[in-house]
A protein has these predicted regions:
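Acidic, Ser/Pro/Thr-rich low-complexity regulatory regions
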Residues: 1-113
Length: 113
């Protein structure tokens, strides 16, 4: 479970996670499907929106859905990923003062198949 003290921490964490995923996509380390399983789903968009996460962040998650369209037509995703990386960096700069003062990741659980 991940616990946040306020919405700003959640927004910063989401942006940091997105930035990392976009960077890994750009480097070819993970697949589009893998990134989707981690964060980029309609469920995550709805959940984050219901918690009051800023629309700019929700829009960036939605933008990732375009990558599937590119992949379906065997087109390069590099330009879109670069734009998403830049946008996530711009948004992250707004959260410089947001700190994580306590451990946020607690109650680890691994489910083995």
């Amino acid at each position: 479970m991940i616990t946040f003290e306020n919405i700003q921490q959640l927004e910063k964490y989401t942006l940091m996670t997105m930035h990392g995923l976009f960077n890994q996509l750009k480097l070819g380390i993970i697949s589009i499907d893998n990134a989707e399983h981690l964060l980029f789903t309609p469920y995550m968009m709805e959940t984050l929106s219901s918690l009051g996460v800023k629309p700019d962040i929700i829009d960036l998650i939605h933008k990732r859905t375009e990558l599937e369209d590119f992949a379906a037509f065997n087109l390069s995703i590099d330009d879109t990923v670069t734009v998403c990386l830049q946008r996530s960096e711009e948004l992250l700069k707004q959260y410089k003062s947001v700190e994580f003062n306590d451990k946020i990741l607690i109650n680890w659980r691994v489910i083995q198949k």
